[in-house]
Curated annotation (Swiss-Prot):
It comes from the Bacteria. It comes from Yersinia enterocolitica serotype O:8 / biotype 1B (strain NCTC 13174 / 8081). GO terms for biological process: proteolysis. Its EC number is 3.4.21.105. One of its GO terms (molecular function) is serine-type endopeptidase activity. It is an enzyme of class 3 (hydrolase). The gene is glpG. Rhomboid-type serine protease that catalyzes intramembrane proteolysis. This is Rhomboid protease GlpG. Belongs to the peptidase S54 family. It catalyses: Cleaves type-1 transmembrane domains using a catalytic dyad composed of serine and histidine that are contributed by different transmembrane domains. Its main location: membrane. HAMAP family: Rhomboid_GlpG (MF_01594). It is found in: Cell inner membrane.
Length: 278
């Protein structure tokens, strides 16, 4: 059997299993203290499951999933669909650090709209010269700066999805270390190419992508994962940034630096798990 994913909402996990049953794919739900794990019986069906899982994660409340439960008869189980609350879902799948960073980014973004980008960057941007090196918050605070609504929405969506599961499964301390280290190195990498005029959480997000994906591949028992299709999309997005296909100003060096840091940290943290499975 292959572990597919861990989901904090047991009812939604069962809905996905029921839906895949209509596609003639046998999955098994294993409840745990933080929700449920979904396991696949036939390894050869993994690519199909990963593809469907990507669609499910984008829209887990789509009526087709509940309809599948009706079709399978599993609505008679003690797993009722509760009234959906975005706030409840947001909180249930994120720890205190995940939520705190989201609130901080939103507060800083609002402040930037009020007083202007320049005023906020003068306090929070990457150190301009050695006179600012001792203002140690600058080595990390640049990650909380966002310059458009699309910029902050995209980053916070990924942050919530990746940091949330990491904090829930591996603890706040592990997430804090990765956040600080990746913010430091991604900021340093970007400063070599663009000076200090940059900001955003994307370097940290790419570190999370690398960490969560590789940890899921090498140590699935730790309960965090990123589907390979989403990881491939993220890499393609990174490559597109270098060729300016999308016409956006993208901090490519921060993305690459963050991704490398995340992969290296995951490789180190899973070195013993990899040896055990060999």
């Amino acid at each position: 059997m292959v572990r597919v994913i861990a989901i904090s909402n047991l009812r939604l996990a069962q809905a996905f299993v029921d839906y895949m049953a209509t596609r003639h794919v046998a999955l098994e739900v294993k409840p745990d203290s933080q929700g449920a794990e979904i396991w696949l019986t036939d390894d050869e069906q993994l690519p199909q499951v990963q593809h469907e899982l990507e669609q499910f994660l984008l829209d887990p409340l789509n009526p087709r999933y509940q309809a599948a439960s009706w079709q399978s008869g599993n609505l008679h189980s003690n797993l009722p669909y509760q009234r959906f609350s975005y706030l409840q879902t947001l909180r249930s799948q994120a720890g205190p650090l995940t939520l705190s960073v989201m609130v901080l980014c939103i507060a800083i973004y609002i402040l930037m709209q009020i007083v202007g980008d320049g005023a906020v960057m003068s306090w929070l941007a990457w150190p301009r010269d050695n006179s600012q090196y001792l203002q140690i918050w600058r080595w990390v605070s640049h990650a909380f700066l966002h310059f458009s609504l699309l910029h902050i929405l995209f980053n916070l969506m990924w942050w919530w999805y990746l940091a949330g599961q990491m904090e829930k499964r591996l603890g706040t301390g592990k997430l804090l270390v990765l956040t600080i280290v990746s913010a430091l190195f991604s900021g340093w990498g970007q400063s070599l190419f663009s000076g200090v005029n940059f900001g955003g959480l994307s370097g940290v997000v790419y570190a999370l992508m690398g960490y969560v994906w590789l940890t899921g591949e090498r140590a699935p028992e730790r309960g965090i994962s990123l589907p390979r299709g989403l990881m491939a999309f993220s890499v393609l997005w990174l490559v597109a940034g270098y060729f300016d296909i999308l016409g956006l100003s993208i901090a490519n060096a921060a993305h690459v630096s963050g991704l490398i840091i995340g992969l290296l940290m995951a490789f180190w943290d899973t070195r013993n798990s990899a040896k055990t499975t060999q």
